[in-house]
Structures are given as structure tokens and as C-alpha cells.
């Protein structure tokens, strides 16, 4: 597994199951991250390492089904509800997007490891691109590179996002961007998830801000 060299395919399946179990518990108000994220992740995988691969797959299927049923029962207010997650409190809608993001990227990892094709359909790619773009302000803030007051325009295919230079900022729609990043949606999504290196975007404007985005972009942490 190139993206997670210490894990087998079965380990990735166990990781995805643990993530869905935690997401379900969080929406029920019964989960909070204790300690470091890496330690929690490693412990979740290690807890299932003695199980046959088939049992881990069945566990993931059950966890994913329970999580989907929970989401299917939500009304509009439920989707807006705030829950605990690995980097703080987020909306249930955002948590759903994060779980899809995690499952898609690890699914692609497993497909590559087993020599199979894995592609994103248009609706999924749109959601993944939206999540990846919207992580820019929080990534800048959490990693000490915030640029309060800056305006960033991201163009990914037919979609575009006007973003602030720090978490919580919402630029005026009429504001002139300090930085414009333009990229192929899939290339941007893979870069944000740490599956590729290099910067797959064209840059217009503030080069130092572009470097800060490149150093802090992450849709998976």
C-alpha cells in the first residue's frame, strides 16, 4: 500500500470501519478524540490485526451501513448539527463529506495495490473537490500560516471558490483575489489528500501565499 506502507489492504479496511464507527458514535454524542490522532488510528488498526480479512470486510460493511442509516434518518436540522471530530467540532454534513473523502482515497489506494481500476464519477469528484478547496483556510490557520484578510480564488474545472486566508473568514463576493489557483479537479483532490507531490495548479498573484497553501493543504487531517 504505497500511501500507507505499514498497512496491508486488510488493515485499511479495518481503518475505514473504525472511522465509520467513530462517526456514528460522534453523531450520537458518544465520541471524542482522546490523545493523538496517529495513536488513535494505529490502535484502531492494531485491534483487528488478528482477524481474518473476511471478518474485517464484514465489519466495515456493517459499520458503513449503520453510518449510512444514521445519515438517512436526519432532517435538515440534523445535518447542520455540530459534532466532535478529529480536528475539532464540525457539522454532520462536513463529517459525512470527510468520511466519503477517506473512503474514496483509501478505495483508490486499495485498487492500485491490487491492480484494479478506480475512478470518481462526476458527483463524487465534485464533492471531493469542494471539500479539498474548502480546507485551505483551516489548513493555513492550524499550521501557523494564516493570512487574515487575504482572498484566495480557487478554480477547479467548472467550479470556483472564494476563500479567506484564515479559518472562519468569508470574503466579500466582490473582493479582488490576492491569489488565484487553477487546477484540474482530480489532480487537486489527489494533491490535497497527499497522494501526489508537486503543485498541480497554475498561480496568479501572491507567490508567498501560494507557497503557504502548498505547505498546508490537506483534506485528510
Give names to the regions the model predicted.
Residues 41-58, 134-149, 216-221:
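Charged/polar, low-hydrophobicity segments characteristic of intrinsically disordered regions
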Residues 5, 155-159, 204:
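Short strand-coil-strand connectors
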Residues 115-175:
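Hydrophobic protein-protein interaction segments
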Residues 16, 20-27, 71, 196, ...:
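Short amphipathic alpha-helical segments enriched in hydrophobics
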Residues 174-221:
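C-terminal interaction segments
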Residues 21-73, 77-81, 118, 123-124:
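Short, helix-capping/interhelical loops that line the mouth of catalytic, cofactor-
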Residues 34, 79-87, 169-172:
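Conserved catalytic-core motifs characterized by acidic clusters
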Residues 2-39, 85-142, 188:
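Short, contiguous alpha-helical
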Amino acid at each position: 500500500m504505497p500511501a500507507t506502507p505499514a498497512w496491508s489492504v486488510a488493515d485499511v479496511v479495518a481503518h475505514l470501519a473504525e472511522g465509520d464507527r467513530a462517526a456514528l458514535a460522534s453523531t450520537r454524542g458518544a465520541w471524542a478524540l482522546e490523545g493523538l490522532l496517529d495513536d488513535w488510528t494505529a490502535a484502531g488498526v492494531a485491534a483487528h490485526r488478528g482477524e481474518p480479512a473476511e471478518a474485517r470486510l464484514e465489519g466495515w460493511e456493517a459499520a458503513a451501513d449503520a453510518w449510512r442509516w444514521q445519515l438517512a434518518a436526519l432532517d435538515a436540522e440534523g445535518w447542520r448539527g455540530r459534532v466532535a471530530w478529529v480536528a475539532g467540532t464540525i457539522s454532520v454534513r462536513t463529517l459525512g463529506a470527510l468520511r466519503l473523502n477517506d473512503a474514496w482515497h483509501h478505495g483508490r489506494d486499495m485498487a492500485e495495490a491490487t491492480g484494479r481500476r478506480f475512478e470518481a464519477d462526476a458527483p463524487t469528484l465534485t464533492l471531493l473537490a469542494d471539500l479539498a478547496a474548502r480546507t485551505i483556510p483551516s489548513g493555513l490557520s492550524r499550521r501557523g500560516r494564516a493570512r487574515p484578510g487575504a482572498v484566495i480564488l480557487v478554480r477547479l474545472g467548472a467550479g470556483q471558490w472564494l476563500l479567506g486566508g484564515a479559518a472562519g473568514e468569508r470574503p466579500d463576493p466582490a473582493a479582488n483575489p490576492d491569489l488565484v489557483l487553477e487546477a484540474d479537479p482530480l489532480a487537486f483532490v489527489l494533491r490535497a489528500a497527499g497522494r501526489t507531490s508537486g503543485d498541480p495548479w497554475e498561480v496568479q498573484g501572491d507567490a508567498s501565499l501560494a507557497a503557504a497553501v502548498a505547505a498546508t493543504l490537506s483534506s485528510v487531517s
